[in-house]
Amino acid sequence: MSQVKYNRIILKISGEALAGDKGNGINPTVIGHLANEIKSVHDLGVEIGIVCGGGNMWRGETGAKLGMERAQADYMGMLATIMNGLALQDGLEKVGVPTRMQTSIEMRQIAEPYIRRRALRHLEKGRVVIFGGGTGNPYFSTDTTAALRAAEIGADVILMAKNGVDGIYSADPKTDPSATKFAELTQLDLISKDLKVMDRTASSLSMDTEIPLIVFNVNTPGNIKKVVMGENIGTVIRGDK
């Protein structure tokens, strides 16, 4: 494993990335692509934890704006992340990657409950672990879940896999031709520049734990492997220094 820069990672996959061009739901072709991309990293001996978003199916904030009780809407979002996780688990197992699904809300018929020590043992044995259900608490995003699980398992980095976005820009490059891409930022930069990369709870936790994040385009073949190998793609976000 001397050729890899990061030996244990948290891969945060947005729900939108799982939907692909469809915009919502789960795209089996995308699942297959991601499974092969993750397998290429797993084959290097890297220990991989995965957190899936649920925005391709449901967002708690959206439900709350429509008049639902926020906590109830957030629980629906947690279920969406579990559905995404199960789809990804199926894809990974089809390409021969041993995978375990753990959920913060107990669903013993379909997944293990989240137990930190058990997750660590799975990682040590070369199994990919998918963390579903968010933190298990309403009002917390899956970005916060990624930061939390990264701290709990001692991850070297959080990889923020984005759908068609190859890093962080000063403005939307699709609408502003003068937008510039940042090679490196700090968590304080995200807050001061009001860059909508992750919510402030997730940003604060990442700053406290000093676990770096890398935002990159997951749609480009080989990008996950390139990041793990230390190639300079995407945008690196560090603590407060």
Curated annotation (Swiss-Prot):
Reaction(s) catalysed (UniProt annotation): UMP + ATP = UDP + ADP
InterPro entries assigned: AceGlu_kinase-like_sf, Asp/Glu/Uridylate_kinase, Uridylate_kinase, Uridylate_kinase_bac
Organism for this UniProt entry: Lactobacillus acidophilus (strain ATCC 700396 / NCK56 / N2 / NCFM)
Gene3D superfamilies: Acetylglutamate kinase-like (3.40.1160.10)
Quaternary structure (record): Homohexamer.
Function: Catalyzes the reversible phosphorylation of UMP to UDP.
Record-annotated membrane-spanning stretches: none
Annotated spans, Involved in allosteric activation by GTP: 20-25
Binding site for ATP: K12, I13, S14, G15, G55, R59, N163, Y169, D172
Full protein name: Uridylate kinase
Any single biological process term in GO: UDP biosynthetic process
Principal location class: cytoplasm
Subcellular location: Cytoplasm
UniProt-recorded Gene Ontology molecular function terms: ATP binding; UMP kinase activity
Entry EC no(s): 2.7.4.22
Annotated PANTHER family: URIDYLATE KINASE, URIDYLATE KINASE PUMPKIN, CHLOROPLASTIC
HAMAP family for the chain: PyrH_B
Pathway field: Pyrimidine metabolism; CTP biosynthesis via de novo pathway; UDP from UMP (UMPK route): step 1/1
Residues engaged in binding UMP: G54, D74, T135, G136, N137, P138, Y139, F140, S141, T142
Recorded GO CC terms: cytoplasm
Disulfide-bond pairs as recorded: none
Protein family according to the UniProt entry: Belongs to the UMP kinase family.
Keywords for this protein: Allosteric enzyme, ATP-binding, Cytoplasm, Kinase, Nucleotide-binding, Pyrimidine biosynthesis, Transferase
Activity modulation: Allosterically activated by GTP. Inhibited by UTP.
